[in-house]
């Protein structure tokens, strides 16, 4: 029988970038931290995430092979409507994201740092936009465990 913790680990490993060298750094509540060579990331699925193929929404904070540090990105459950704003709310703080298709991200490194700081102390974050069909698209992520997962990923990539 699969317990909640193992289900989260299995789900996040599927949502994370594919590679044979992937290493789980830990699961921290609903957030996981992973390493794949010189890439590291903290990642979570939204509450009530769909398990259907093609609808694997997630939020991640990553460190990459091209020098990215604490880069925030989101995969939406569906493609967003062209021209629709993408808003991220962390408790009472509001951030404007940019993106296209089913992806959204912070505008620059400064915005990444502000979002990560808010995630560290926040309780919940919600990303909202309009889907291509005009329907409201909203994903909510509990932030319990996010700071620890972010730290685990940052430390793992600092060692490379």
Where are each of the predicted segments found?
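Bacterial N-terminal signal peptides that target proteins for export
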Residues: 1-8
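Hydrophobic h-region of N-terminal signal peptides that target proteins for export
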Residues: 11-20
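A generic "folded-domain core" signal
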Residues: 19-160
């Amino acid at each position: 029988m699969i317990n909640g913790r193992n289900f989260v680990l299995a789900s996040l490993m599927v949502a994370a970038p594919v590679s044979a060298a992937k290493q789980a750094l830990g699961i921290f509540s609903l957030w996981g931290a992973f390493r794949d060579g010189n890439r590291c990331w903290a990642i979570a699925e939204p509450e009530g995430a769909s398990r259907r193929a093609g609808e694997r929404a997630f939020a991640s904070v990553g460190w990459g092979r091209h020098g990215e540090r604490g880069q925030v990105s989101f995969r939406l459950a569906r493609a967003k409507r062209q021209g629709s704003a993408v808003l991220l709310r962390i408790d009472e703080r509001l951030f404007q994201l940019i993106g296209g298709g089913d992806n959204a991200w912070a505008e620059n490194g400064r915005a990444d740092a502000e979002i990560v700081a808010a995630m560290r102390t926040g309780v919940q974050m919600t990303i909202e936009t309009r889907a291509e069909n005009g329907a409201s698209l909203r994903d909510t992520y509990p932030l319990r465990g996010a700071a620890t997962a972010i730290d685990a990923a940052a430390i793992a990539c600092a060692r490379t």
